[in-house]
Amino acid sequence: MDQNPNYNFGYGQAYGSGTDHTSDSTNNYNWASQWSQPESAASLATHTFPQYVSQQQQQQQQQAQQQAQNTYAAMNPISTFMQQQQRAQTFPQKKYGQQGGAPKPSAIRNNNFGAFGGGHALSQEWVQPMSQNQMGGPQGNRFFNNQKGGPFNQNKPNWRQNKPKGPAAPKKFDSTGKSPAMLLHELFKDVSEEYTEVEGVPKKYCCTLKVNGRTFQMESVNKKAAKQKCSELVVRDLRPDVHVTPFEEGVAAKAAAPVKKEIDAASGNGQNNKRNLLQADAISNQPTPKKVSAVKKAKLQLTPVESALSLLDLMQKIIAESAEKYSPVFEASEVPKDPEIPEVEVKKEEVDTNGENVANEKKSGWRKNETMHNVTLKFVEQNKQYTKMGPSRGVLKDMVIREALRDLFNVSHADITTVARRHASNRLGHDTTILQCLNTICSILNCTLTIECEPAEDRPLGIGRAYFMAKCTIIDHNENDLKFEVKSSSLASKAMAKDWVAQETLKNYFAIDPSSCVKTDAVSSQGPCALLHAMLNKQTKQKCKIAYEFKDNVPPVAGQATTTFYCECVIDETDRYIGVGRSKKLAKSEAAMQALKKLFKIDYDPAGNYPLALTSRAMTESKVSPLCRHIAEFCKREYHQMTEYYQIPPSNLFAAFLLVNAQEEKRVLAMGSSIQYIVEPDTLSGANGTSLLHLDAIILARRAMLKAFIHELSTVDSECSIFEKKEEGKAALKPNLRLVLYSNYSPPCIHAVDDAATKKLSYVTPTNLTCVPDDVLTYEQIKETKSLRVHCTADKLFKWNTLGIQGALLSNVLHPIFIDNIFFGSEAPVSDESLSYALQGRLGPNENEREIIVESMPVQMRMHMGISHLWHRGVDSVETLDYNTGRTSKGSPSRVCKAEIFEAYRKLNGVDQAVVNYAKAKEMASEYQYEKKVFYEKLEAAGLGKWQTKPAELVDSFTLAAFD
């Protein structure tokens, strides 16, 4: 089981918008109150020439107008009022007749009401053209006057020609889809607003609006809600004629269910034909169906154990369902301190890296005695009383409730455990830590908990922090004192070790998974900006200064239709992270996500959960695999033991190659330590392969490993060899072995990462890395300029991961050998994904079929340099080097120089002894040379630059005779 589980912290953010419900309590005019309605033909018919009307006639006309409005609302299929009206309403006849016109219809049908098609199932923006059957005639009973007078060329009455025009009706203000604040600023131009913070818990804000010389105030939990509520108050007070949608916090409108279209004369299949009219008439003439009351399904009744959220809730539910009367009363009191008990002196001892106690660094202090409490639960009617004493009143309260449930209500231990587990799961992650949760549930369930922490046996050697191991022991008194133990591996701190054992105990013994115990409404509601603030404050234990700066006057990108916004997230005025988006909000969120990825190694996912029960240090540590941590400690221990044995000053600039078998057993092949240095070209002239060109910890370890490979090839026929013979005669690494590279520091790769400004191959200069040019230096140019272009370590690792680490010479006797894992013992300046891209993925994901795992430890390490030295398996000494000459400190050729490797290679069985030239021996590996040529061509095609090869006459054109 992974000892550091990788948690997906979480977040869920509800996006949605919609209009709030209307203030109408009956909800009869919900749709009509939000949209302005057009005047129907029935309402237009009431606008006639003014004449004397008696009081009785006025009442009749008002009733007719009200009845017409009700009829129009009834014809509206979206309005809920229409669903309550089952029978069509009729209009009364006018007192006066129409000269030369047909009489008014006595009833209005649903399918041809008004000029705006009120019987349509949905209110369309475009009104379909009416057919002849709809416009007039005996079927529709509708007539429109022509230019000569009434219908069918009848004369128009004279009294209509002199009808006076009344004043224009005021334009109705449309408040559809507008919030109270929007209405406020549209209706009133002179508005001043002011916000003040209201003291109290929770914190509130007061919004003060001054409009037309009047002052209005409202309070809410945030400024936005306070302004919306205050704006609603202003509009309702100063403009009562305007409909205001009430503002409610946290209410999102849900999508309405699709309304099935009804068949009427104005709709159907988009054609106005006689069949549609007949269908509409048939539907309108059908009798009104009787409402059938739906049979209510019986609600599922949960038992108190199934629904209780805590032990107190369980007891209250049982009492509510019980016929007997129970009156529980809690009493809590503080136990008086005994003056005779003195305060305890506590001494803390610091442990150095060698595990010895440092006497002069002891820190002493005084710890006050814990305050004890008495908690009592009384049942007066039953004459029962339960009392517990301890330091925590909350835990004591749960303990007395448990005793009452077991004794008085006969609740089983399994049911109490179920409710206690549910209670702990709900609290874990937002108001209790893992240790607090474990301590609480153990106290409630009558279990004895003991957590011990001590320095780990595999503590790191040399300069570094000590590692710790924790052991958690539980004795369950409900199960005949059953004992359960969990031990952690070596972790970087006591807190992390305790968190780990507590987490495993909750998961394996109490069936509580801390990774899934997330309060969705508190944690998941946070966006990337809020999550960044919370995690930074939790990490630094203080409020960090975070600012978001938007870049103005950014020129638009050619061919891009939308505007792009840029935002910088500035943390403590030093670190800057840039985000880009189509809006300022998206750019700000992107900048926060970049900061989360760089600082906490979190790829933000809106659908994920991010529990904050663990500390940020524990979250970062949980990203590291156990193999990476074990390899790092194993290599450090082996290196320091080697330097101590050979009396070599240690350095933390070292790298090692090792093999790991299926049983996770490890064997070191080679180690190297050195600063990065390039030997001068004059030193190589006439050296004949006896001088090292590039000194670096990884480069020296790789050359030493080649020498170890040659030593293992001499014993390839034995069972203990790491190689096995293939049919074609070449040897191959056994399939159960994995080659692992470990280095304390990651190689510089500023031009090789995926987000580099210029993605190019680079070579080493005395101060930094420089992008390669488009040409290669010749031998004469090197002699003239006295400069070499040697590729950086990251480029060489990229080449080895593509062609094999064995090189051209050993490809004559070996199949390609590739690195399986690359681990770095300190935190890299870039993410692990960028490192993996630089070391294996620069040509695309399809070019390299092998997956190489690249990881780095989240540890800050101070560089400590020493002399250059190396060691490999098969020799009993450490070789020290002089980086100025590329030879040993005594001036002799290094055992890993090209000449020494070539001489050891020629001693292998099956090697052509006639070939004494080093360059010619490398050319004999035809398959490797072909793959190398293709690799160089792909680099140029990808725009990464030209590989800087060195002239053969400078480094490879030597023979063993010349060397002797």
From Swiss-Prot:
This protein's record includes keyword RNA-binding: yes
InterPro entries noted in UniProt: A_deamin (IPR002466), dsRBD_dom (IPR014720)
The subcellular location is: Nucleus; Cytoplasm
Tissue specificity is: Expression begins early in embryogenesis where it is detected in late gastrula and comma stage embryos. By the comma stage, expression is highest in developing neuronal tissue in the head, tail and ventral side. Neuronal expression continues through embryogenesis and, by the L1 larval stage, is the prominent pattern. Expressed in most, if not all, cells of the nervous system at all larval stages and in adult animals. Also expressed in the developing vulva but not expressed in the adult vulva.
Q: Which CDD domains match?
A: DSRM_SF
An example of a Gene Ontology cellular component annotation for this protein is: nucleolus
Residue ranges of every copy of the DRBM domain listed in the record: 179-240, 527-601
**Cited SUPFAM superfamilies:** dsRNA-binding domain-like
Q: So what does this one do?
A: Required for the hydrolytic deamination of adenosine to inosine in double-stranded RNA (dsRNA) referred to as A-to-I RNA editing. Does not have deaminase activity but binds to dsRNA and regulates A-to-I RNA editing, possibly by modulating the accessibility of the double-stranded RNA-specific adenosine deaminase adr-2 for target adenosines. Regulates editing efficiency of specific adenosines in 3' untranslated regions of target mRNAs. Represses editing efficiency of the Y75B8A.8 3' UTR in neurons. Required for correct expression and A-to-I editing of clec-41. Required for normal chemotaxis.
Record's miscellaneous remark? Can prevent somatic transgenes from inducing gene silencing via the RNA interference pathway. This may occur due to A-to-I editing of transgene-derived dsRNA, preventing transgene RNAi.
Name of the protein this chain belongs to:
A-to-I RNA editing regulator adr-1
Q: Name the source organism.
A: Caenorhabditis elegans
